[in-house]
Amino acid sequence: MADKVIAYASGLESGGVLSVCKHFPGHGDTDVDSHKALPVLPFTRERLDSVELYPFKEAIRAGLGGMMVGHLQVPVIEPIGGLPSSLSRNVVYDLLTDELAFKGLIFTDALAMKGVAGNGNVSLQALKAGNDMVLSPRNLKEEIPAVLEAIEKGELTREDIESKCRKVLTYKYVLGLKKKSYVQLSGLEQRLSLIHISEPTRLQL
């Protein structure tokens, strides 16, 4: 599987599309949908290293650009019961960034999912855990002020946020975003609507 991941992701990135491997540290051998609840990976560290983490390690070794951290409970790495891996500094920073030396962009899974519910301000926790980007926060009106307040209190530093921003901008530059022409917003909805697409084109979709 790792070979297929690397081949597919390398193809994406060679075409200017960021590849994002998911769901770290492994969502394959679970019987719970993290959209609905928090899955548990009740395995030993040896098992995680040899099975769940293996394809991610290979992707990191190949230099692929993105990683999405899933909402998973991994007791052998994060001892706090009920704390999802996406909000765990033990998982995001200590394991992914430090131990596995991943230098690319780190995304959370969608923060509106039930697998991460009940953990307070999840955007703030995700940033403190080491994620670079938070996906689909539930309530931006509450979560942005909480991040700003955390900076004022010293729980996060302005340098932390600026570092994440530079990382995002660097990847946009490397992937050639600056070279792309901008999308014309005028008439965009009409162009994207299936009603206005010719029959042969619609069949191709």
Predicted regions and their residues:
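Second-shell residues forming the walls of enzyme active-site clefts
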Residues: 1-149, 157-159
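Short amphipathic alpha-helical segments with coiled-coil-like heptad repeat character
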Residues: 59-62, 176-177, 205
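Charged/polar, solvent-exposed surface patches and flexible loops
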Residues: 94, 149, 163, 170, ...
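Mid-to-C-terminal alpha-helical segments outside catalytic/metal-binding sites
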Residues: 152-180
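Flexible, acidic loop-helix segments that line cofactor/substrate-binding pockets
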Residues: 179-191
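A glycine-rich phosphate-binding loop feature that marks nucleotide/adenosyl-phosphate handling sites
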Residues: 28, 144, 165, 184-187
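Single conserved hydrophobic/aromatic residue that forms the stacking wall/gate
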Residues: 195-205
